[in-house]
Amino acid sequence: MQEIPLWYWLIVFFGLGACVGSFYNVIVYRMPRGISLINPPSHCPLCKKRIPIYYNLPIVGWLWLRGKSACCKQPISIIYPIGESLCGLLGALALYSASGFGTDLTRPVLAPETWANAAAMFWLLLGAYPVCAVDYKYKLIPDSISVVGIVAGLLISLVPGGITPLQSLLGAVLAGGGLYLLGWVATKVLKKDAMGFGDVKLLAGYGALMGVTGAVETLLVAAMLGVLVMVPYGMIKNKAASAKANGAVNSAAKNENDSENEENGQIPFGPFLAIAAPVMYLWGDALFSLYVNYVFG
């Protein structure tokens, strides 16, 4: 393995990312609907015929079928290969960033910490996709992402060069526990649910990967991103609500859907955590130094 060049492993990580992206398509569709991820097997949604495994190959399957199902020739959304390609690129980016970027793709990947960082970035980048998609639309974060993230963080800490297993365990407990306590207090003060338990488990996973400091930095950056997005979003929602009150007519079904997906005009917090985490994992120390230098001169 020591003699295999970086470009080869980038292709491997692209393929792994595309496979994960294909599985995420299943998660995004099935979990919010309460459908098992295993049964029934992949099948055509129209005629219910089982899809052979060779047609399920990420990206290749869609190209092979020319964007139409083999059984009843119905169009297959291009979103599927686009999502798989994006996840493939994110998978390759995970290893590329862990190896220090650079232009020499012929160098071998030797250091154990490089593989540990690549595994961490792989989960951070690939996990962001279903968190953003599912949490925004359905206001839930799959346990297959948050809980697996905690386990992955604890296992990665066993590789020398990163945080220690104790730091990883403390990061998971203190980050998750701290956010749970913060949400509990906010719920009591505001007299309504202020924090979902999915966010708690997600931050616990980030704590397991980055330690307490990294998780706290991620939480702060996510909160700032949330403010930057929610302020203009809230203004737009209020303006739209005023327009409706002045005579705009919407169907009851549309109103019910709006209420379900955008309750109280709010966007779930999970996507902001998922975006902030890989940024802080890569550049947290540098960004913190810039902030300190800017504030304190």
Where are these regions (language model features)?
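Select subsegments of transmembrane alpha-helices in polytopic membrane proteins
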Residues: I78-S85, D143
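Functional transmembrane core segments of multi-pass inner-membrane proteins
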Residues: L105-P108, P112-E113, N117-M230, G234, ...
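Membrane-interface helix-boundary signature
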Residues: L6-W9, K73, L110-A120, P142, ...
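Membrane-embedded alpha-helical segments in integral membrane proteins
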Residues: L86-T106, A152-I156, G284
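Hydrophobic alpha-helical transmembrane segments
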Residues: M1-A18, L154-G161, A274-G297
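Membrane-proximal soluble regions of multi-pass membrane proteins
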Residues: Y24-I79, N246-N261, F269
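Interfacial loop-to-transmembrane junctions
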Residues: F197-G198, M235, K239-A240, K244-G247, ...
